[in-house]
């Protein structure tokens, strides 16, 4: 009873918090679902780089729904899924909400509307749908494509006497480059694992060079064998890289966002498994290092027979809450949020690789050109296939692997148990 009372108190507090400092909390969002007002929760609309995107999306929606008010409530990302979870528990909240692709949305589809009947006309234009679907149904429309290219600093390669236009193809070559880079005064990897996020980037960024094609495809299909040789090698490599001092110092006390990225941008590390969109990506790195010094490479081959590819999925996407009173109206807003003009602004201002395949990115520089070219042979990211519960556990275990308080075999045993269907 005490636990139940405590949870009730926490839930009330979180719901109250979600309205603090903004024009709308869950109660107002509930009132807003009568057709006269739609409330959107996200963590993007408050960013200056998203201002033009939001403005164009609202203008597009207003053409068809001039009498409907749209209100965006930008929540802090660190608390976003806690606040959203509280709203879901209460059965009331925003009409439209932003999700990361993968486990975060798949774990919550019972609270969302399947939007397939509303977005059929957008299926060919937009890419990245699979990350927002479950059991053959679609629950959000992709705004961005998100992936994990391996960025490298061409200026550091030159300083180390390496060919900046010929990144390593094998792990042996990669380690040799790391040794040369160390002599030049830099670390091999920028790494931040304070929140347990570093292992996600490592797994997806390097995984296609470690797992065999069958191991990779089985993993994505949900037939995961946590004792498969490639899977075990991936976690061994995570520990080996740390033990060998290839990471920037203090990985477990360094935040990925944005301290680890800053290490790469400042020239303290030669490689960074980053993002394609939003942050820690080509546009940020271009600003600090200059476009001509930002290289992009795919994973070096660790296991014979591995076929390296760019790991990517739908990045972020907007979904419709089950409690909204007019799902079609809310879905129309989602369509406006994924309209070509709006997404073109998001690409131009924020550097997002938009889900809209018709947007011209030819003037963005060599890093983007490489990323876009690699999309054709790309595959879904390994960590995106996991549930949020398993992702959280993997983050904690990755920290323990670095500190030496758990072995690879023990970690894999726990992860296998977590990954079993409920």
Predicted segments with their positions:
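Short, well-ordered beta-strand elements
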Residues: 33-46, 68-73, 95-96, 139, ...
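C-terminal capping/gating helix-and-loop segments adjacent to ligand/active sites or protein-protein/ligand interfaces
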Residues: 349-353, 357-358, 367-419
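Extracytoplasmic/periplasmic substrate-recognition and gating elements
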Residues: 63, 160, 243-247, 285-349, ...
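Extracytoplasmic/periplasmic solute-binding protein
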Residues: 139-143, 148, 173-224
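Extracytoplasmic "Venus flytrap"/periplasmic binding protein-like
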Residues: 59-126, 159-161, 166, 262, ...
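Short, low-complexity disordered leader/linker segments with a strong preference
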Residues: 1-39, 63, 119, 358, ...
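Hinge/lid segment of periplasmic solute-binding proteins
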Residues: 100-149, 175, 295
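Glycine-centered hinge/linker elements that transmit conformational signals in sensory
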Residues: 176-178, 220-252
């Amino acid at each position: 009873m005490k636990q139940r009372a405590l949870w009730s108190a926490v839930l009330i507090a979180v719901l109250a918090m979600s309205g603090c400092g903004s024009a709308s909390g869950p109660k107002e969002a509930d009132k807003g679902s009568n057709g006269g007002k739609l409330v959107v929760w996200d963590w993007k609309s408050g960013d200056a780089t998203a201002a033009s995107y939001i403005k164009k999306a609202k203008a597009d929606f207003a053409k068809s729904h001039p009498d409907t008010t749209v209100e965006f409530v930008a929540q802090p990302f660190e608390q976003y899924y806690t606040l959203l979870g509280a709203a879901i528990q209460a059965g009331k909240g925003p009409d439209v909400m932003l999700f990361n692709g993968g486990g975060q949305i798949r774990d919550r589809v019972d609270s969302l509307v399947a939007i397939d009947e509303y977005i059929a006309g957008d299926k060919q234009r937009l890419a990245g749908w699979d990350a927002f679907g479950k059991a053959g149904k679609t629950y959000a429309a992709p705004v961005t494509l998100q992936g994990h290219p391996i960025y490298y600093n061409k200026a550091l390669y030159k300083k180390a006497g390496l060919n900046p236009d010929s990144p390593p193809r094998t792990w042996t070559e990669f380690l040799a480059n790391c040794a040369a880079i160390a002599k030049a005064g830099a670390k091999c990897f920028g790494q931040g694992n304070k929140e347990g996020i570093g292992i996600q980037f490592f797994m997806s960024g390097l995984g296609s060079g470690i797992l065999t094609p069958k191991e990779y495809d089985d993993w994505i299909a949900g037939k995961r064998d946590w004792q498969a040789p490639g899977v075990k090698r991936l976690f061994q490599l995570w520990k080996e890289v740390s033990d060998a001092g290839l990471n920037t110092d203090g990985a477990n006390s360094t935040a990925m966002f944005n301290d680890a990225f800053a290490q790469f941008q400042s020239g303290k590390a030669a490689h960074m498994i980053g993002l394609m969109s939003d942050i820690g990506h080509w546009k940020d790195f271009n600003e600090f290092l200059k476009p001509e010094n930002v290289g992009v490479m795919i994973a070096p081959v660790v296991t014979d027979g591995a076929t390296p590819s760019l790991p990517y999925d739908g990045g972020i996407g907007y979904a419709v809450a089950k409690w909204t009173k007019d799902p079609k109206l809310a879905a129309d807003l989602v369509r406006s949020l994924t309209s070509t003009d709006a997404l073109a602004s998001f690409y131009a201002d924020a550097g997002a690789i938009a889900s809209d395949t018709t947007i011209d990115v030819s003037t963005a520089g060599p890093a983007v050109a490489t990323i876009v070219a690699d999309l054709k042979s790309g595959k879904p990211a390994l960590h995106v296939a996991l549930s949020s519960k398993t992702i959280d556990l993997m983050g904690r275990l990755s920290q323990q692997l670095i500190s030496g308080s758990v072995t690879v075999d023990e970690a894999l045993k726990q992860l296998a148990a977590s990954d079993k269907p409920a």
